[in-house]
Regions:
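Alpha-helical oligomerization segments
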Residues: 180, 184-188, 192-246
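N-terminal, leucine/charged-rich tether regions that mediate assembly and partner docking
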Residues: 1-120
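Extended aliphatic helical segments
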Residues: 17, 78, 103, 128-129, ...
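A generic structural signal for ordered alpha-helices
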Residues: 3-8, 67, 80, 145-153, ...
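Acidic-enriched, low-complexity/disordered segments with a strong bias for Aspartate over Glutamate
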Residues: 7, 43-45, 56, 65, ...
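Extended assembly-interface/linker segments at domain junctions
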Residues: 88-93, 97-185
Length: 246
């Protein structure tokens, strides 16, 4: 059998589960709306709980405080029929009530999602997603040098066994460094990397909005003003990229 990316992380066999999760489990166990049920039914080929890490299976200490509950971590592989609603699908799978590392597979391409969670202040038995981070799609048969280095960095030996919070955060930091590398050209990061990447993505979104408005605008004066605004945003973007490069 061909090894998947998760197999290549060299997680101990004691953590291996390889248990298929059925679509009906999501429909029956979570309060999904009609749209979410359609996404589960139409977009997933297979979903498998590949590895489950807890203190009984691996020498990593659980971590919990008033805001966090990292007592176990699951690695889940999702084979897709469609990638069009990926982020919505990820949101549904993240209803599973513990920290997850999701690997979406579309034939030979993969996308990784990591979504740190905190304890719901209104119901301490529940976790809510703080933010959700995705890699771009990586072609495993045609990966470039940085993609290859990133995938190697995901091997379990490259992450701290201090506790599950530090362990999970390390995976998140690797993902953020990879996303930043498309601007910096390197997997190196510093304490400002996450914030700079967030600002870059915000500016890029604003640039796309302005470009769309320019295409639709018929008034010459308004179009000129929009182009001036676009120039300022592009300058800001270049400045942020330079800062990210260190």
């Amino acid at each position: 059998m061909k090894k998947t990316l998760l197999d290549k992380l060299y997680i101990p066999n004691s953590c291996k589960v390889s248990r298929k999760l059925f679509k009906k489990q999501f429909i029956e166990n979570f309060s999904l709306n009609t749209s979410e049920k359609a996404i589960i039914s139409e977009d997933i080929d297979n979903i498998t709980l590949e590895y489950l890490l807890n203190k009984d299976k691996i020498n990593i200490t659980p971590f919990s405080d008033e805001e966090n509950d990292y007592t176990e971590i699951a690695f889940i592989r999702v084979e897709l029929l469609s990638t069009k609603r990926l982020k919505k699908l990820s949101n549904i799978i993240q209803y599973i009530p513990y920290p997850l590392i999701l690997v979406f597979a579309d034939e030979n391409k993969i996308c990784i999602n990591i979504s740190p969670k905190r304890i719901n202040k209104n119901d301490s038995s529940k976790l809510v997603v703080e933010d959700s981070y995705f890699t771009e799609w990586i072609d495993l048969d045609n990966s470039n040098q940085i993609e290859h280095e990133f995938l190697e960095s995901l091997e379990i030996k490259n992450h701290p066994f201090t506790n599950f919070f530090e362990f999970y955060s390390s995976y998140l930091n690797k993902l953020i460094a990879f996303n930043a590398s498309q601007y910096s050209g390197s997997l190196e990061q510093n304490e400002d990397t996450r914030e700079l990447l967030r600002k870059i993505q915000e500016v890029e979104s604003s640039i796309n909005d302005i470009i769309s408005k320019i295409k639709k605008e018929s008034d010459i004066r308004d179009k000129v003003n929009l182009n001036i605004e676009l120039k300022k945003l592009n300058d800001k973007l270049e400045n942020l990229k330079t800062r990210l490069q260190g």
